[in-house]
Amino acid sequence: MDPGCAYSTNLAATVVESVKAGKSKAETFAALDSSKWAHLQEPKLLDDAVQIPVAGAPSIGPPNAKITIVEFSDFQCPYCAIAIGEINALLRAYPTQIKLIFKQFPLETHPQADLAAAAAIAAHKQGKFWPMHDAMFAHRNDLSRKSIMLLAKQNGLNMDRFEADIDSTEVRETVVRDVQDGEHAHVEGTPTLFIGGQRYNGQVTLASLKPIIDGELAGAQTGTRNKAGN
């Protein structure tokens, strides 16, 4: 159980409430399909659009994309790892219409996530963010300093520069700013997505995200989409 991951937090709350109410195992499982869990699964955008600073953050997709998705993520979060394939499928489905921006949000419950976040930013300074992103998620159960250095070497980073950058004040402050940006946007767990500046509520799957994207694209054409300037 990971208290910082968005989905597990909601699941745990449902289970705890069922146990407190003295419900049986069968009733508890049934509760997971009830209103609260169904609400979590219902894909929609919440709240008004917010401004999230993204200058200098790693991104993928065309700079003039109609839709910007900002992802707050943690390299040791199991749900973030699962979401990678779904987000990649979304980017393939909309190759000219979506830009994805990655923001660090290492959770306190993940002891190696903060170092991994610094490593990702250090790799970004050498134009190697996405290779390190993929490598660290693939090895998320061991993101010790030794493991991260090995992954960096395998991905062709300049190791002298990487080792200096990972411990630099500049990189550490970037991690802190990303976390603060997430907190200001009311990020409570990972992964958390903002689509056009609005917080996304729902499963991070292609099936759940596609209707949201289609709706945003339709809104962009008619000028009714809620804009945040991200």
Q: Which sequence ranges carry the predicted segments?
A:
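All-alpha RGS (Regulator of G-protein Signaling) helical domain and cognate RGS-like helical scaffolds
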Residues: 37-54
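C-terminal cap of thioredoxin/glutaredoxin-like
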Residues: 18, 38, 68-73, 79-91, ...
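A short beta-strand-turn-helix
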Residues: 51-67, 92
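Short, charged, surface-exposed loops that flank catalytic or proteolytic processing sites
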Residues: 17-28
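Short N-proximal segments of mature Sec-exported proteins
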Residues: 1-14
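Loop/turn elements at helix/coil->beta-strand transitions in domains of secreted/extracellular proteins
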Residues: 25, 65-68, 95-99, 126-131, ...
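Conserved helix-turn-beta segment immediately C-terminal to the redox Cys motif
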Residues: 84-105
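Short, internal strand/loop/helix patches
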Residues: 120-142, 151, 156-163, 170
